[in-house]
Amino acid sequence: MFARAPFVRLLSTTSRNLAEAEKKVSKEALMALRKKTGYSYVNCRKALIQFGENDMDSAVKWLKEAAAKEGWAKAAKLGTRVTSNGLVSVVTDNSTAAVVELSCETDFVARSGAFKDLLSNISNSVLAKAKPQSISSGSKLQEFTYDLGDLTDSDGKNMREVLSLSIGKLGENMTVRRVKAFKAPEGTTLFGASHPKDGTDDIPMGRFISLIALNQSSPGSISSQQLAGQICQHIIGMSPESLGEAAESVKTQEGLRSQEGHDPNADPVVVTNIDESETALLRQAFMLNPSQSVHEYLKSHNANILDFVRVELGSE
């Protein structure tokens, strides 16, 4: 019985040595893998123990495969949770635009960089998918709806897989409620804006977005970009329901301000009657100058709008 003691001690020593060897993961390697992949320190440590610090490629591959499994499992587990927060994005490139609505459970996640990166990724994949799309003739925006499973990111990953990985990382249920693209007729430029301005440097994001198809025959006193930004903000703030037609101008003396010395025999001025309850965009009082209609403001800058889109987070 006593003869077996050295063997028992040997097993104990061997197990302790193995455990100590497993713990020998350098802080530098752990931080490098964490920075490269974005996965948790716990999983990065597991990968380094399994493959060693000299085989980072295998460690990264293992992490991605593990994350995919965890992400799909977590996505299924969290799938019934309500997603009442999130952001809507709008990204444009000349005559093509993408509008994506991504929802999550909390405002905290909606404001995170990881959430915005995911929304940017989806938005850019929609834009890339839509750019070569041909459209029929007409003067209105043409709309296309895509399934997330038909989209890939710049690395060729299916966007459904990308979404599941993000759910696994962020630990919240997320749903993509709107995946749309818009194309304008040739020669027309699309512009977009958001409110509040919660997006990235490249992509406007917010609770509200608007998109307009703008033509400008010649440069006005402000740039097309600035003009479009003003109209987009008007659309977000005033919630027009249709484009409509320009209101008829009438000759009237009522448009003249009453002032001392005014000649009552002077020619009447041309004014536009503006209804404060108007829901057609072109006939609404322009938000930045209520004495003008939107149509009049556009006309003063040699511009016109062919169509527009307004989206609010959670709307149908």
Swiss-Prot record:
Report if keyword Transit peptide is assigned. yes
Official protein name in the record = Elongation factor Ts, mitochondrial
Record-stated family: Belongs to the EF-Ts family.
Transit peptide range per the UniProt entry: 1-18
Q: What does this protein do?
A: Associates with the EF-Tu.GDP complex and induces the exchange of GDP to GTP. It remains bound to the aminoacyl-tRNA.EF-Tu.GTP complex up to the GTP hydrolysis stage on the ribosome.
Gene3D superfamilies hit by this protein: DNA helicase RuvA subunit, C-terminal domain, Elongation factor Ts, dimerisation domain
From the UniProt entry, list the residue stretches annotated as the region Disordered: 245-269
Keywords from UniProt, A to Z, are:
Elongation factor, Mitochondrion, Protein biosynthesis, Transit peptide
Q: Which PANTHER family match?
A: ELONGATION FACTOR TS, ELONGATION FACTOR TS, MITOCHONDRIAL
Domain of life of the native organism: Eukaryota
Task: Name the gene that codes for it.
Answer: tsfm-1
What is an example of a GO molecular function annotated in this UniProt entry? translation elongation factor activity
Q: NCBIfam families attached here?
A: tsf
The subcellular location is:
Mitochondrion
| Pfam families recorded | EF-Ts_N, EF_TS
Instruction: Output the GO biological process annotations, alphabetical, semicolon-separated.
Output: mitochondrial translational elongation
Q: GO cellular component terms?
A: mitochondrion
Q: What main location does UniProt list?
A: mitochondrion
